Amino acid sequence: MFLPNDTQFHPSSFLLLGIPGLETLHIWIGFPFCAVYMIALIGNFTILLVIKTDSSLHQPMFYFLAMLATTDVGLSTATIPKMLGIFWINLRGIIFEACLTQMFFIHNFTLMESAVLVAMAYDSYVAICNPLQYSAILTNKVVSVIGLGVFVRALIFVIPSILLILRLPFCGNHVIPHTYCEHMGLAHLSCASIKINIIYGLCAICNLVFDITVIALSYVHILCAVFRLPTHEARLKSLSTCGSHVCVILAFYTPALFSFMTHRFGRNVPRYIHILLANLYVVVPPMLNPVIYGVRTKQIYKCVKKILLQEQGMEKEEYLIHTRF
């Protein structure tokens, strides 16, 4: 097929516009995104530190929570630093290889997070529906296999997206009206047919819908088991056990659902609304997850409080030693 002279099969770089229509507000929009990133990093690293240092938390539930915290750090780090570069210092250019790398990590961590939420739903299901067999079913080996499966599944689904982009020729327009590189945003810049890319995108959406369906079915069984419990206190305790996970599920899938609905059916919705929803989908869950678990999970809350009190006690001892001598 003949291509025009200005065609580059693989361009040297792309230009990320940020949030089209809100360019004058970029510098101010950057501050809440920076705050979100700081909270996400501090919160998730705190959870990882607490789980690592406290042996009482070496249980399947907290191993899955550690996986969630790791994917949250990866997802926020893959998106927000570049976003802040666009907002604050007009660093809009991104080389082709870096764009593909960012796309890979964003989609990879998104699929990993969805899979971890499925694993956590299974953990809750076993804990509520088969409590006596919990330790026999969810052994350390099983948790390790699930963790490996989360990683491998994401790779299997994401690697084709890179190959599908590499096969496309890119014509004159190298401007991406977004804050980060993502599969369909890049595909739409191509001058070739992107039918296969669209089919791949629909398969990826079906993958997330499958995860949501599995989680929903798990909680249907959980609720049935909970309402069969003999006492009101037992029912409340069981529901509280699942409360944190439900909040995390809503924090992850709700922005994603709104983003998908406006992208597919909101043709009259301004572009900046699409971009803001897409950003919420990848930056809000990493911030909310550690806050939700820190507040709602007693073991995490107690361990963080214990560490803080120990540090305060050490500082007080050092102060007394210095004042005495």
UniProtKB/Swiss-Prot annotation:
Main localization category: membrane
Function: Odorant receptor.
Extracellular side: 1-27, 78-101, 163-198, 260-274
Localization annotation: Cell membrane
PANTHER family according to UniProt: OLFACTORY RECEPTOR 52E2, OLFACTORY RECEPTOR 56B1-RELATED
Transmembrane segments: 28-48, 57-77, 102-122, 142-162, 199-218, 239-259, 275-295
Pfam families linked: 7tm_4 (PF13853)
GO molecular function: G protein-coupled receptor activity; olfactory receptor activity
Entry GO terms, CC: plasma membrane
Family classification: Belongs to the G-protein coupled receptor 1 family.
Residues bearing carbohydrate: N5
Classification via InterPro entries: GPCR_Rhodpsn, GPCR_Rhodpsn_7TM, Olfact_rcpt, OR51/52/56-like
Membrane protein topology class: Multi-pass membrane protein
The name this protein goes by in its record: Olfactory receptor 52E2
Keywords associated with the record: Cell membrane, Disulfide bond, G-protein coupled receptor, Glycoprotein, Membrane, Olfaction, Receptor, Sensory transduction, Transducer, Transmembrane, Transmembrane helix
Protein source organism: Homo sapiens
Side of membrane Cytoplasmic, spans: 49-56, 123-141, 219-238, 296-325
Keyword Protein biosynthesis applies: no
Cystine pairs: C99-C191
